[in-house]
Amino acid sequence: MFVARSIAADHKDLIHDVSFDFHGRRMATCSSDQSVKVWDKSENGDWHCTASWKTHSGSVWRVTWAHPEFGQVLASCSFDRTAAVWEEIVGESNDKLRGQSHWVKRTTLVDSRTSVTDVKFAPKHMGLMLATCSADGVVRIYEAPDVMNLSQWSLQHEISCKLSCSCISWNPSSSRAHSPMIAVGSDDSSPNIMGKVQIYEYNENTRKYAKAETLMSVSDPVHDIAFAPNLGRSFHILAVATKDVRIFTMKPLRKELSSSGGVTKFEIHTVAQFDNHNSQVWRVSWNITGTVLASSGDDGTVRLWKANYMDNWKCIGVLKGDGNPVGNSCQGIFGSSVGSAIQSLQNSVNGTSSSGRKHS
């Protein structure tokens, strides 16, 4: 059975994001109190705050970990129109600091003229790259050419999405058959604007990102978006958090069917749509194999979704903050599968937790 542990976060305002590192033993939180906190898991399973610092001059919307191959590196983004990259260093300068760690700001990315709403490191096979999106509808992709010098970042790409951007997700596939791809969600509140999820793909010929697809069926504001880890699948799975939970499959069409030399075209299907939260859904997060999806909503629950052998998606668990499963609101199974799902979520490849908006 899933065990819930309450953590006294000591944030002074709303907590907007919770992010696990690659191994699931470190956690970062960010808040409207303009701070980021880093938590480490002890041997007995307790979480201890090991660092807390003021990061921005506005609400901090998102925080995310780089792959540990690049060291202990965080990125944050804020209403103050900036994103920042932070690195943990172990003090060696004098006896007092030796062995103690602290976080140092390596760079501030100041290209946005409006609130920076999401920040995500690219999959590690692409090198140390970072994507941001902002309320003015621009996605920016930066690269650190020297991974030993995180103070130098170059702006590689600017993508104009024409809609206010709220969230981004890299396609984690490392297959050479798949070009780098990024999904962008919009929280534009106008019901007349369709297609609030856009997919951009990198074109080797033009060396630019071009729009590959628009999910026209998504017309409500999008709060979160997440590609599933791709373990040998020939197609992609994308989860979208809006007023409900939606799961899409994207199957690449054969090259002769898509324009030669252009972007890949996809056959897109909505394979699941769940309104069980009966409220806005704020976060979606996959486990490490891309087989279990967690969602969290304003109903105060985390719901777990999994496909059966017929590829029908079902709810397999509903969790509340007190650790108790919620009775009959989910037809599925509880017990070991839920526990293992939560464990795999903590070891999620993209390090993102499924926690939605939380109060401190």
UniProtKB/Swiss-Prot annotation:
Q: Is Membrane among the key words of this record?
A: yes
Q: What does this protein do?
A: Component of the Nup107-160 subcomplex of the nuclear pore complex (NPC). The Nup107-160 subcomplex is required for the assembly of a functional NPC. The Nup107-160 subcomplex is also required for normal kinetochore microtubule attachment, mitotic progression and chromosome segregation. This subunit plays a role in recruitment of the Nup107-160 subcomplex to the kinetochore. As a component of the GATOR2 complex, functions as an activator of the amino acid-sensing branch of the mTORC1 signaling pathway. The GATOR2 complex indirectly activates mTORC1 through the inhibition of the GATOR1 subcomplex. GATOR2 probably acts as an E3 ubiquitin-protein ligase toward GATOR1. In the presence of abundant amino acids, the GATOR2 complex mediates ubiquitination of the NPRL2 core component of the GATOR1 complex, leading to GATOR1 inactivation. In the absence of amino acids, GATOR2 is inhibited, activating the GATOR1 complex.
Q: Can you cite a GO biological process for this protein?
A: protein transport
Show the Pfam families listed in the entry: WD40
Which key words are in the record?
Answer: Cell cycle, Cell division, Centromere, Chromosome, Chromosome partition, Kinetochore, Lysosome, Membrane, Mitosis, mRNA transport, Nuclear pore complex, Nucleus, Protein transport, Repeat, Translocation, Transport, WD repeat
Q: Which protein, by its recorded name, is this?
A: Nucleoporin SEH1
Q: Which GO terms describe its molecular function?
A: structural molecule activity
Question: What family, per the record?
Answer: Belongs to the WD repeat SEC13 family.
UniProt organism field: Xenopus tropicalis (Western clawed frog)
Compartmental location: Chromosome, Centromere, Kinetochore; Nucleus, Nuclear pore complex; Lysosome membrane
